[in-house]
Amino acid sequence: MDQLIQLVEATQQRNDIPEVRPGDTVRIQLKVIEGEKERLQAFEGVVIGDKGMGASKTITVRKISHGVGVERIIPVNSPNIESVTVVRSGKARRAKLFYLRKRTGKAALKVKERKSASAEA
């Protein structure tokens, strides 16, 4: 039974999505269907948490829009995702960055930047 579940999940996994961790700033291009029209909508924000694994993995992305915090829970393996780009890698000491919800202004998006391996060499 377990092998059957793994087989089904393996077919639903997407390999074109980069590894995203809490603290990273990401830009996600989502397909939005309005009536008969289809367009792309960009959502850029800080990943404040991830949940699940395999085909059911989701990430929570938070951004500040016109002074109001907006969070969106996005299934990583959704067919509505056109692309995911890591704009900035953040260094977080927690798995869930819910403390960012209490912050306002620029402090709400402030996460230390992670040094990349290529920058050190």
From Swiss-Prot:
One of its GO terms (cellular component) is cytosolic large ribosomal subunit. GO terms for biological process: translation. Pfam families: Ribosomal_L19 (PF01245). GO terms for molecular function: structural constituent of ribosome. Transmembrane segments: none annotated. InterPro entries: Ribosomal_bL19 (IPR001857), Ribosomal_bL19_CS (IPR018257), Ribosomal_bL19_sf (IPR038657), Translation_prot_SH3-like_sf (IPR008991). Keywords: Ribonucleoprotein, Ribosomal protein. Belongs to the bacterial ribosomal protein bL19 family. HAMAP family: Ribosomal_bL19. This protein is located at the 30S-50S ribosomal subunit interface and may play a role in the structure and function of the aminoacyl-tRNA binding site. This is Large ribosomal subunit protein bL19. It comes from Chlorobaculum tepidum (strain ATCC 49652 / DSM 12025 / NBRC 103806 / TLS) (Chlorobium tepidum). The gene is rplS.
